Amino acid sequence: MSKSVALLLLCACLASGRHVPTRARRQAGSFTVNSDGTSGAALKVPLTGNDKNVLSAIGSADFNDRHKLSAASAGLALDNVNGHGLSLTGTRIPGFGEQLGVAGKVNLFHNNNHDLSAKAFAIRNSPSAIPNAPNFNTLGGGVDYMFKQKVGASLSAAHSDVINRNDYSAGGKLNLFRSPSSSLDFNAGFKKFDTPFYRSSWEPNVGFSFSKFF
């Protein structure tokens, strides 16, 4: 992603005039288990900030259905009290190579009942573990909706150049338990991809996510 696009996302995070103090989120960590046997863990540690913006260190690890590491990421995230955000991450994928990604989120609407956000991301893929494989880019975006912090839905799509692959996903979330310090969610969704040579069917997946806040 170009520097101008990254700066535009950063400005969107910082320039909003709406101030909703309850929107500030300080997530310490989360753990997810999926129906296909995969799992993941994520950690966010605030480094510095004020009453409007918080800069955090972030990290995550994903595991396959044999409980072996399938991806590890680390980076920085900037969160705004109005629900906007920007992140920069580096990812190592065993058997593939590395990824460098930037992502942005802009909150479009928020009140006591509804929360709607748009997101976009760009990833530079470097398949160093695959001989003679070229680097390529993945660009994508989507929308997230939440009703009363209880029921949510999301849609996203992404396109990878060189390999000419398109990915699509649709999902829903149901909050089962929430307290000031923790949250338990049930997730369900479908995903598919297509290339010039093959198109997958919609594949279902369900899982549970537990988050701890501080």
UniProtKB/Swiss-Prot annotation:
Location relative to the cell: Secreted
Similarity section: Belongs to the attacin/sarcotoxin-2 family.
Tissues with expression: Highest expression in fat body and hemocytes and to a much lesser extent in Malpighian tubules, silk gland and midgut.
Record keywords, A-Z: Antibiotic, Antimicrobial, Cleavage on pair of basic residues, Immunity, Innate immunity, Secreted, Signal
Propeptide residue span(s): 20-26
Family matches, as InterPro entries: Attacin_C, Attacin_N
GO biological process, one term: defense response to bacterium
Expression triggers: By bacterial infection.
Descriptive protein name: Attacin
One Gene Ontology cellular component annotation held by this UniProt entry: extracellular region
Task of the protein: Hemolymph antibacterial protein. Has a wide spectrum of activity against both Gram-positive and Gram-negative bacteria.
Keyword Calcium: no
Organism: Bombyx mori (Silk moth)
Signal sequence annotation: 1-19
Keyword Hydrolase included in the entry's annotation: no
Database matches in Pfam families: Attacin_C, Attacin_N
